[in-house]
A protein has these predicted regions:
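Catalytic His-Asp charge-relay segment
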Residues: 173-179
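Conserved alpha/beta-hydrolase catalytic His-Asp/Glu region
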Residues: 126-169
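Conserved HGGG/HGGXW glycine-rich cap/lid loop of the alpha/beta-hydrolase fold
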Residues: 4-43, 68, 86-89
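Gly/Ala-rich beta-loop-alpha elbow adjacent to hydrolase catalytic centers
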Residues: 71-76, 80
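Flexible "cap/lid" loop of the alpha/beta hydrolase fold
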Residues: 85-130, 157-161, 166, 186-187, ...
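Conserved loop-alpha-helix segment in the C-terminal half of the alpha/beta-hydrolase fold
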Residues: 180-205, 209-212, 217, 224-225
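Active-site loop/oxyanion-hole signature of alpha/beta-hydrolase fold enzymes
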Residues: 37-69, 84-85, 108-112
């Protein structure tokens, strides 16, 4: 039996490795690493930036013995895109309603410097908080699960969403884009545009957080991607 690659999870803004727990429970037998990005956290004075995040992603992947598939959610697509150019052990990237930007792009720059109305900006302190997270992130998540997730959200580094990508790993690593068709954080139309950069496109009829609303479906998609990567 062919062994599967290691799966590395990279969370999005305001979140942490905890957001993957329900998916991880459904991936028995898979070697998994869930990264904590320094740009998200509960102490605004200690938040890192995009390049700190990319360094962590590179470091965790480097520590894996064998092939790797990386799954990024939302903002997590930015450090993954930045970090993995030339890392040959990475067999495939999965962008789960994630930011698959190009060289020179930043999340804020993609909006011409105008933040979404649901970003609460703390520019002097260098961080952002989400307004209306229940509506924006968790529209199809059951109320107890959504409430627990909201209680765990941290602050997000403003620098991380302002800094440009200096390289794009999806140019030399194959990728799958998973479009979330009821997403209120990253508009599905924007996801459709980014998905043109991917080798495969899948769709979920979910909000921005399918790892909470449809964890079994996300796990199925990822197991299939791991099998495909192992067979290549």
């Amino acid at each position: 039996m062919v062994s599967l690659p290691t799966l590395v999870f990279v969370h999005g803004a305001w979140h942490g490795p905890w957001c993957w727990d329900l998916v991880i429970e459904r991936l028995s037998g898979v070697d998994i690493r869930a990264i904590a990005l320094p740009s998200s956290g509960h102490d605004p004075s200690k938040l890192g930036d995009l390049y700190n995040d990319a360094e962590i992603v590179r470091s965790i992947v480097a520590d894996v013995d064998g092939p790797v598939v990386v799954c990024a959610h939302s903002y997590g697509g930015a450090p993954v895109t930045e970090a993995l150019v030339g890392v040959r052990k990475v067999r495939h990237l999965v962008y789960l309603c994630a930011w698959q930007g190009n060289v020179g792009d930043s999340l804020l720059g993609a909006r011409h410097g105008i933040p979404p109305p649901w970003w609460e900006m703390h520019e002097a302190e260098g961080y952002i908080d989400p307004l209306r997270p229940r509506e924006i992130f968790y529209g199809d998540v059951d109320p107890p699960t959504a409430k627990a997730a909201i209680a765990r959200l941290g602050h997000q580094s403003l620098a991380a969403v302002s800094q440009p990508l200096t390289q794009a790993s999806w140019r030399n690593i194959s990728s799958t884009y998973v479009i979330c068709e009821k997403d209120c954080a990253i508009p599905p139309a924007a996801q459709e545009q980014m998905a043109r950069r991917a080798h495969r496109v899948k769709r979920l009829d979910t909000s921005h957080s399918p790892f909470l609303s449809r964890p079994s479906r996300v796990a199925d998609i990822l197991r299939n991607e791991l099998r495909a990567a192992a067979a290549d």
